[in-house]
From Swiss-Prot:
GO cellular component terms attached to this protein's record: mitochondrial matrix
Record flagged with keyword Transport: no
Stored NCBIfam families: ArgJ, PRK05388.1
InterPro entries the record matches: Arg_biosynth_ArgJ (IPR002813), ArgJ-like_dom_sf (IPR016117), ArgJ_beta_C (IPR042195)
Family membership: Belongs to the ArgJ family.
Organism of this sequence: Heterostelium pallidum (strain ATCC 26659 / Pp 5 / PN500) (Cellular slime mold)
Primary localization: mitochondrion
Protein name as it appears in the record: Arginine biosynthesis bifunctional protein ArgJ, mitochondrial
Active site, per annotation: 204
Superkingdom field: Eukaryota
SUPFAM superfamilies: DmpA/ArgJ-like
Subcellular locations according to the entry: Mitochondrion matrix
Pathway info: Amino-acid biosynthesis; L-arginine biosynthesis; L-ornithine and N-acetyl-L-glutamate from L-glutamate and N(2)-acetyl-L-ornithine (cyclic): step 1/1; Amino-acid biosynthesis; L-arginine biosynthesis; N(2)-acetyl-L-ornithine from L-glutamate: step 1/4
Protein keywords: Acyltransferase, Amino-acid biosynthesis, Arginine biosynthesis, Autocatalytic cleavage, Mitochondrion, Multifunctional enzyme, Transferase
């Protein structure tokens, strides 16, 4: 029944990689990378993103009470400067600079000031870090790495930038999108890292989105909040929340489109949808690359009384170790799913609940849907279990992409989350990774 972990690790990451167009990257942005020695592998561990024009910026940060030095510094810089006028971002991997006290904050400031100085940027650089918690950065290495990265700045090598921010990731994560707005075509690119400690609201995950759209700070903030809710706050790998996670979007206005100031305008809604598509693809890449994962799992909740309650139920299922273990074992254990629905905290009626397992994303599964018997099976009908062929169910769940669809019978709201199964490889990977 079980596939070998080695086979899975070879198969899954390749499905994440996507083609990208170097002529569709946002105008005015450059990236530079370097290997300074923070990573024992010798791989690149410094990334700089620079815009020739000052950017409006929006960002969301970890909700963990323990926040890393770069998170504290970047929040302060953004608030002090009203989220505008930024030209650069510096990221290091190989060290989280979290739980490092005053020295850690001093090191984050050094990274910020050195980057902006070398780039001759008028405003301090934002900072992100990722890696092991509780260790001071070797600043002699970091400072040399920043200087080296500045010399490599170019407009087309975003994939190297995505590689430079990886930690336990197996593959780089990059997505892009273009959209025609009033006054010109706008380009969007996003890179992110993350494979473990992934849980709403965000987790050990860094993401930077850059666009050449002209948009106000308030509109950019609203756009990012919407996009993150339906992407990074809708994924779960292991239920752990990190100290460092950050999502930031930079907009430099180089596309020449009509400046967006109204969140109800057609241009805003089109741009918001495009950014949401980019962040959703990146979020799904994180789940597909999750530590030890062999399955990409879509959880769809229908018939909730509110979207928020649907999200709570989906989250409860996605964090259940029993559900995730059963999926790895290709066991359609609907009882574990129903239990997770029941303890979610949402007031549901068990006698109204219907449930299906399916291969793929489950979009055609549920009440009033196609429900193709070749790709889906219903296991629960208004709280009553249905007799099913367990061998056929196991075959259905042998696919790399599977779905759990739950109908609550409470209303018309829906919610979707993405998660993965729980395997021996996850335990193995995290038993050898400090903090």
């Amino acid at each position: 029944m079980y596939k070998s972990i080695t086979t899975l690790l070879k198969q899954q990451p390749q499905s994440i990689l996507r083609n990208y167009s170097t002529d569709k990257f946002p105008r005015g942005f450059k990236t530079g990378t370097a290997a300074c020695g923070l990573k024992k592998t010798g791989n690149k561990d410094i990334c700089i993103i620079h815009s020739s024009a000052p950017c409006n910026v929006a960002a969301v940060f970890t909700e963990n009470k323990v926040k890393a030095a770069p998170v504290l510094l970047s929040k302060q810089l953004l608030e002090t400067n009203n989220y505008k006028g930024f030209n650069s971002l510096v990221i290091n991997s190989g060290g989280a600079n979290a739980c490092t006290g005053e020295q850690g904050l001093k090191n984050a400031k050094t990274m910020s000031n050195l980057t902006s100085s070398l780039l001759k940027a008028p405003q301090a650089s934002l900072v992100m870090s990722t890696g092991i918690i509780g260790q001071q950065l070797d600043m002699s290495k970091v400072e040399k790495g920043i200087a080296d990265a500045v010399t490599t700045l170019n407009e087309s090598d975003w994939i190297s930038a995505a590689r430079a921010i990886m930690t336990t990731d197996k593959v780089p994560k990059l997505a892009q999108k273009s959209v025609s707005l009033n006054g010109g075509e706008v380009h969007i690119v996003g890179i992110c890292k993350g494979a473990g400690m992934i849980h709403p609201n965000m987790a050990t995950m860094l993401c930077t989105v850059c666009t050449d759209a002209s948009i106000s700070e308030d509109c950019l903030r609203a756009l990012l909040k919407h996009s993150v809710h339906y992407s990074f706050n809708s994924i779960n790998v292991d239920g752990d929340m990190s100290t460092n996670d950050t999502v930031a979007i930079f907009a430099n206005g180089s596309a020449g489109n009509k400046h967006i100031t109204d969140t109800t305008s057609s241009d805003f809604l089109q741009l918001q949808e495009a950014v949401r598509e980019v962040t959703t693809r990146l979020a799904q890449m994180i789940v597909r690359d999750a530590e030890g994962a062999s399955k990409f799992v879509t959880i769809k909740i229908h018939g909730a009384d509110t979207e928020q309650n649907g999200h709570i139920v989906a989250n409860s299922i996605s964090t259940s170790s029993l559900v995730k273990s059963a999926l790895y074992g290709e066991d359609a254990n609907w009882g574990r799913v129903l239990a997770a629905v029941g303890y979610s905290g949402v007031d549901i009626d068990p006698l109204k609940v219907c449930m299906w397992f399916a291969k793929g994303d489950g979009k055609d599964v549920g009440l009033g849907k196609k429900n193709d018997p070749e790709t889906s099976m219903q296991f629960l009908e208004k709280g009553t279990p249905l007799a099913k062929d367990e061998n056929k169910a196991a075959q259905l769940l042998s696919n790399n992409d599977v779905a759990i669809v739950v109908e609550l019978g409470m209303g018309k709201a829906s919610s979707t989350m993405w998660t993965c199964d729980l395997t021996e490889e996850y335990v193995r990977a995290n038993s050898h990774y400090r903090t």
